[in-house]
A protein has these predicted regions:
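Interaction interfaces in information-processing and related assembly proteins
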Residues: 3-186
Length: 186
């Protein structure tokens, strides 16, 4: 059918039909909420970079955050870069996103395998370690905006919550998760 053909073309172009972002605004734009499903994007990154489960979880969290933060930018040519650099085995993660929420990224050491944390979960914080989160917004001005904060936990979401409060003075709550299947797919 023509719909199946279009879906295949979109997939080739990197447009994932099942991934989406929902935005909500309340209280005269004083409150904003974003929710995203990025399963296909994260699974594609896992396959393309042959990432271990903990590397997939770390990259997936940052890809999702990048996509949501990308759509917060106004200009069509605006580019957002998120960089996590830590002393853990992953060493670093870099993600770039545009204002349409299209995102790509990589992990410096994609094949890291470490034991689960005390809760029996993938230990993203342990794999990232101590370091910093840098947010670069290139909005076509002479110089890009660069904000940097120390990593709070290395778990990505808490680090972004801290970034929004410290660098952008925006009280926020950020939650990010990547559910891995037993066969290591997303």
């Amino acid at each position: 059918s023509s719909q199946e053909k279009k879906a295949k073309q979109n997939k080739k172009r990197g447009k994932f039909m099942s991934d989406y972002i929902v935005r909500a605004i309340a209280a005269d734009s004083q409150i904003r909420a974003f929710a995203a499903v990025t399963t296909e994007t994260v699974e594609t990154a896992r396959k393309d970079h042959n990432t271990s489960p903990v590397a997939t979880a770390a990259l997936g969290r940052l890809l999702t955050a990048g996509s949501m933060m990308g759509v917060m930018m106004k200009g069509d040519k605006d580019i957002l870069t998120l960089q996590v650099k830590g002393d853990g085995l992953l060493q670093g993660i870099t993600v770039t996103a545009d204002s349409k929420g299209r995102v790509k990224g990589y992990v410096v050491e994609p094949d890291v395998i470490i034991p689960a944390n005390a809760k029996g979960k993938l230990d993203v914080g342990g794999a990232v370690g101590h370091g910093f989160l840098q947010v670069i917004k290139d909005m076509g001005l002479k110089e890009p905006y660069v904000g940097q904060v120390a990593l709070q936990t290395g778990e990505i979401a808490e680090d972004l919550t801290y970034y929004f409060a410290a660098s952008e003075q925006v009280p926020s709550a950020v939650g990010l998760g990547v559910l891995m299947n037993k066969d290591n797919t997303v």
